[in-house]
A protein has these predicted regions:
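Extracytoplasmic metal-acquisition and chelation regions
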Residues: 2-11, 16-315
Length: 315
């Protein structure tokens, strides 16, 4: 990649100072060096690339991916990678790096079919205050929900696109990439069937979530999303919006408000307490932490299934 010389020079000096005597290995030269911007892309690359890729994830374990700011070391990692796989408008600092990376950057947005507006799944009249965390440090996802991986069928389409991109850069292993993507699609198809079956008959179809990350999940499995914080996890709903949502929860006899793992649960807990509901965890799987109900995407999705079955009173 060809990032600005000043940035790379700064990153090189910082990395040299921090790595003196560490014996850091930069790869064996026989694998495709792929940098991903957050966990679901890392997981897909690992599944599709297998032994032929070496993956570095820019969003570290336990970090909220929306908040990512690239360090000098990460800028250098991006500049040295064969590919940068990212989702445009999800992480502004990565967008900046991708612009400089040119042809080495691969945006999965088209393959993900980001065509559902999060607002269509928010509670009517649910506005949010500006201020600390209100605009989430200026992050702008546009009107579409970026969390495509919560619909396994869209995730499979992205995996296919990743396979084709890897095949283009590493034609010697093209057959392996395509075979791995086919296997991954089969796994995701099975997961989708589990979700369809498990969520086919639920008494409550209003899904009250921490932030509007579940538009694709809701659309795929027959729910209507009501978000506390909109698309940005740090946004603060106005008092009137909170009161409106509390009234809605009571009127519709909603029993569960879903919190997340990577952001504070205060708002969800307050909402649930004031509305007489319980709090459960519904993980948007933006990253895996010690608090995650599973060690990888598949396990956490199945934990989500169990949580929603209980919270939405599914039979």
């Amino acid at each position: 990649m060809n990032l600005p010389r000043a940035l790379v020079a700064t990153a090189t000096v910082a990395l040299a100072l921090s790595a003196c005597g560490s014996g850091t290995d930069s790869g064996d030269g026989d694998t495709v060096q792929v940098t991903t911007s957050f966990y679901p892309l890392e997981y897909a690359i690992e599944e599709v690339g297998g032994e032929h890729v070496e993956v570095t994830n820019l969003t570290k374990t336990g970090a909220e991916p929306h908040d990512l700011e690239l360090t000098p070391r990460q800028i250098l990692e991006v500049s040295e990678a064969d590919q940068l796989v990212y989702l445009k408008q999800f992480q502004p600092s990565v967008d900046d790096a991708a612009e400089e990376a040119g042809d080495a950057a691969f945006d999965v947005s088209s393959a993900a079919r980001l065509d559902i507006a999060a607002e269509e799944h928010e509670h009517e009249g649910h506005d949010h205050e500006e201020g600390e965390g209100g605009d989430h440090a200026g992050h702008d996802h546009g009107s579409q929900d970026p969390h495509f991986w919560l619909d396994p069928t869209r995730y499979a389409d992205v995996a296919d696109a990743i396979a084709e991109r890897l095949a283009e850069d590493d034609p010697d292993h093209a057959a392996d990439y395509r075979a791995n993507a086919k296997d991954f699609r089969s796994t995701l198809t099975g997961l989708d069937k589990e979700l369809k079956t498990g969520l086919s008959d639920c008494r409550q179809t209003d899904l009250v979530t921490g932030h509007a990350a579940f538009a694709y999940f809701a659309d795929r499995y027959g729910f209507h999303q009501e978000s506390v914080s909109g698309l940005s996890p740090g946004a603060q709903p106005s008092p009137s919006a909170m009161a409106d949502l509390i009234d809605h929860i009571k009127e519709e006899e909603i029993t569960t408000v879903y919190a997340e793992t990577l952001v504070p649960q205060d708002l969800a807990e307050t909402l649930a307490r004031d509305a007489g509901a319980e709090v459960a965890v519904l993980d948007p799987i933006e990253g895996i932490t010690e608090e995650s109900e599973g060690e990888d995407y598949l396990e956490v999705m199945r934990s989500n299934l169990a949580a929603v079955q209980k919270g939405q009173d599914c039979s």
